[in-house]
Amino acid sequence: MRYLLIVITFFMGFSSLPAWAMDCYAEHEGGNTVVIGYVPRISIPSDGKKGDKIWQSSEYFMNVFCNNALPGPSPGEEYPSAWANIMMLLASGQDFYNQNSYTFGVTYNGVDYDSTSPLPIAAPVCIDIKGAGTFGNGYKKPAVCSGGPEPQLSVTFPVRVQLYIKLAKNANKVNKKLVLPDEYIALEFKGMSGAGAIEVDKNLTFRIRGLNNIHVLDCFVNVDLEPADGVVDFGKINSRTIKNTSVSETFSVVMTKDPGAACTEQFNILGSFFTTDILSDYSHLDIGNGLLLKIFHNDGTATEFNRFSQFASFSSSSAPSVTAPFRAELSANPAETVVEGPFSKDVILKITYN
């Protein structure tokens, strides 16, 4: 299963640190501390290349709440941090990363962090700590984090998280007999330290589960867009009528089995329209000019941005090519004023296999 990235443009005529204790939860104190991304049975195309993302979870949007910080390495402050995991041992006792077939990681606030290069990610907030450094049993005044006389003893900050798996080598070199642990801690929110398997009961963790559901295929498909340039042009839009009537244009995704591949197995093609821009909800992308973009499947159901849905199914006896038609719709955002002038928006089409 490999991600193929295609850009669709919509046009319209208008260093390692010591470990210090801190509790972190989802949303509020005592909230959830475990988020699991389940890997379904997925398939990797035979032309998969080293570094390709073969699985990516849905995006998780949430607030992280942290408190109960103990004295940290710097007087008066300790940053809640998210680290890519440092190490996990296989049952055989080998270093987890030495399996050399897959790399695990996390996309944190839009930036990828591979497990092979763990780096601290400092949140833009901190907690004042009693008795840190030279301040005895009190707090530094003014407090470092609050900036005032009263210390800041807890923080809440928003995060966007996706978990992923990459190929560490070309698909045709992957060890097909490899057995992995069922669960992997990819991301942990805590004080300035690395993620790990100990003392995580009060540390919010994001985990990948189902690592042995990965299968290498003997086939792959070529993906094309119609129109071929990937531009969906809405032409000129009347700023008055768009307030009451939506406008639509169609495009298609064409998937064709490579004629040189064996293709003896059954597999499905999943697709996701991906964006890092603002979503009004999972089905509506904010264009930024008072309009919203929505994409529909051929059966009339709306797609959800940044989430995968089935585009096609192939088998040894199926037709060599499948076309998936879509309809892109623009409508007025009821909460904003429509701004006249030319605009465009890029959306990335991600293709994967299972």
Swiss-Prot record:
Keywords: Signal. Residues 1-21 form the signal peptide. The keyword Signal applies. The keyword Signal applies. GO terms for cellular component: pilus. GO terms for biological process: cell adhesion; response to methylglyoxal. May be involved in a fimbrial system chaperoned by YqiH and exported by YqiG. To E.coli YbgO. This is Uncharacterized protein YqiI. It comes from Escherichia coli (strain K12).
